[in-house]
Amino acid sequence: MPKSLTHNGVLFPQSFESKGFNKIDNIEISLLAEEMLWKYSPYMFNRFKNDEVFIKNVWTDLKPQLPKELQNKEFPKDFTKLFVAMQVASENLKLQKSEYNKSHKKEIEKEKNERKEKYGFCYKNGKKTEVGNFVTEGSRWFISRGDLRGRWVSSVNAEDVEINSSEKVPCTQEGHNWKKVELRDTDYIATYKINIGFGTAYVDKFVWLSANSEDKQKDNEHKYEKARKLLLKIDEIEKTVLKDVQSKNKLKRENALITYVVLTYGIRIGNDLGEDNFRDKNVRGASTLCVENMKLENNNKIHLEFIGKDSVPYNETMEIEPIVYEQFSKQLSGKKSSDKIYDLATSSTVNAYLKSIYDGEITVKLFRTAKASGLLAKEIQKREWKNLTDKEFKNNLMKCCLQTSLLLNHHKTVTEEQKEKATKSAENKIESAKNALKRTEESAEKKLAKLKKAKKDFKDCLEGKLLEEKLNEIKIKEKELKDKISKAEKKYEDTLKEVEFKQSALDINLGTALNAYSQPKLPISLCKYADKDPSLIYSKAQLKKFEWANKVSKDFWRKYPNV
């Protein structure tokens, strides 16, 4: 518990102002209905335009806000003209903002910096510490891959916000009061719930200390160091788990079975929060699987098929130890397809079990971090890293990260439209590289032909030292031109490899594993070894977040334990 925590509270987004679309077919609509329609209009033209669940949910929440005369319309078809007009108006507003004069832009920037200084920092035990996003979330359509996608998220008021502070904090919303102000032993300065679908669901939100804050930096470093130490004991832990799979104690046996699956294949424990901190009852993980999610196959193989966190499907066949296969066979016996595989074990009992077999702080998430970091180290240690171009270096490292992301099942939804766009972009890139190579080859071949003729002419009319000098000059130019062709060919080959990799990883979220599960000292030490700038791999925000990793030696990646 901090002795003191002081700050100026959180801010609220500006309320929606009418954009002039307050009538439909000469029928007046409410400001809320206009806001809902305005904020839906972009979705008419992106990946949600054909999402039936999203559209159905939007209409569920929008319809009651419209006058009765408009409730019989077909949504979204009968609103198409309105949405097009709204998008045109939206683009015009963006254009107006881009045309602000310098003094106006400076004034906006000044106000932004003043807000940041006043609300973007807190004082924890007297020490100034940066806060993350100090503005509460605004009203919007709920974007996720779960069944609630397309429901309306209502705006937040001060009465919804609990403030974590050791002193009174004046309310920043005029005419309102905070729900509660008290000092808590947490890393957030405020918490509130967002209301989805007019009371259908509520989701907790937090205003955390910034990832760049000293406390967060220390926590991050500590997490990855714990994961490294855990890797050193992983073989010993796996032996214990295999022994406990045969335990006469049913709870211990179930805990060990779940741990085995998590340890071996990096599957999430289950019962965790998805996008927007929402727990979807249809989402499965290692501890929440039903009989229908697991199929026993021949040769000690099981097939797992379920919907995981963030509605990402998991569909894999895996080979397991014979004793584990035998226990799963017993576990499934006599159960209906809708029954849970485990009768006693939960995510909480698994974490308690892990603490009982390992002397140190441990959770399933830490196991996933350890496995991800160990696999990244293994992939990195397989390769040569000297004398690579920046593009080669980045592509090779991303290929290593791909294996980590596959282990963690970090997939993302890719629509047919996005696939087509990516394919077209790939084709254009290859065509452009092919044309560039062709131009280089044709230009160089013409020059080489001229040099060949010049060489013959010199031999016919010159001799001695002068001839030798001229032939040497031609030899140098020929080498330069051949090198130019070789470089162009290499560039073309690199483009083909890059495009092939991007296409293969189209539905993989490479960033999550790199940013949240993989020891950042590995890429940073590798960059030092290969004399590359870490900004090739990490964004500015990530580099700031991982500032603590900068002191790493250039050989750290060589010595890191792998899996």
Which residue ranges define each predicted feature?
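Extended accessory and catalytic-adjacent subdomains in large enzymes
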Residues: N177-W178, K193, A201-A449, D494-A541, ...
